[in-house]
Swiss-Prot record:
Its EC number is 4.2.99.20. One of its GO terms (biological process) is menaquinone biosynthetic process. HAMAP family: MenH. GO terms for molecular function: 2-succinyl-6-hydroxy-2,4-cyclohexadiene-1-carboxylate synthase activity. Monomer. Pfam families: Abhydrolase_6. It comes from Salmonella arizonae (strain ATCC BAA-731 / CDC346-86 / RSK2980). This is 2-succinyl-6-hydroxy-2,4-cyclohexadiene-1-carboxylate synthase. Keywords: Lyase, Menaquinone biosynthesis.
């Protein structure tokens, strides 16, 4: 089994750019940024529970990792960079730490390296369980209205919140809930030690108004790019700034 994806061909011999979206996004999320790098082949993946992969069930990160590997193999992708936002960033970090073949470098935007104690994991498990129950039972427009009131999204304007709520409400609540539980931050190991031992390039992007993830970026051995005029979702709030950072990273 493989994940649904959109494939945009580039020049042969260049490493692929493989983009992983955040929770409740889909393969379109990274395209305004990724399509600025037309010399590279690009693969925009729908993670399980999302978009064209909505019907693919997973029990945890191990299943997501195997699906990601199978998808890369199906496209004969032998050299690539992983670029992931939030949930996609966590999946990318997990894959990098497990040693996915062919990985040339890692770019993470606003991805959490992992909780560091059992109390924090228990609290997060409870919180994610409550959100999952709401995704299953309530209209998505209601749930996402509240979702975007969370502190990590304080930089969003009312208009941006409204637009994101309308966009994300096109998802399937049941499959979102299942993916949220399967890939909860509570189920993710603390990756700091493994990330700090990586031998290939590792870059971290965060919005200048995202104080939580700017602090987390200092806890991993990554080169940090701070995106001006942006909060947690930097590639949506300032796509040109993220394009500039990626161009520096990829030297394109």
């Amino acid at each position: 089994m493989m994940l649904h994806a959109q494939n945009m061909p580039g020049q042969s011999g260049m490493p692929w750019l493989v983009f992983l979206h955040g929770f409740s996004g889909d393969c379109r999320e990274w395209q305004p940024v990724g399509e600025q790098f037309h010399t590279c082949s690009r693969l925009y993946i729908d993670l399980p529970g999302h978009g064209g992969s909505a019907a693919i069930p997973v029990g945890g990160f191990a299943d997501v990792f195997q699906l990601l590997r199978a998808t890369l193999i199906s496209y004969n992708i032998l050299k690539f960079w992983l670029v992931g936002y939030s949930l996609g960033g966590r999946v990318a970090m997990m894959a990098a730490c497990q040693g996915i073949p062919g990985l040339c470098g890692l770019v993470v935007e606003g991805g959490h390296p992992g909780l560091q104690n059992e109390q924090a994991r228990a609290e997060r498990r409870l919180s994610d369980g409550r959100w999952a129950e709401r995704f299953r039972r309530e209209p998505l427009s209601t749930v996402f209205h509240d979702w975007y009131q969370q502190s990590v999204f304080t930089s969003l304007t009312a208009q941006q919140r409204q637009a994101l709520t309308a966009l994300r409400s096109q998802n399937n609540g049941e499959t979102l809930a299942a993916m949220l539980e399967a890939t909860s931050l509570a189920a993710q190991p603390d990756l700091r030690e493994a990330l700090n031992a990586l031998t290939f390039p590792f870059y971290y992007l965060c919005g200048e108004r995202d104080s939580k993830f700017r602090a987390l970026a200092q806890e991993v051995a990554a080169t940090c790019h701070v995106i001006r005029n942006a909060g947690h979702n930097a590639h949506r709030e300032n796509p040109a700034g993220v394009v500039d950072s990626l161009a520096q990273i990829l030297r394109l």
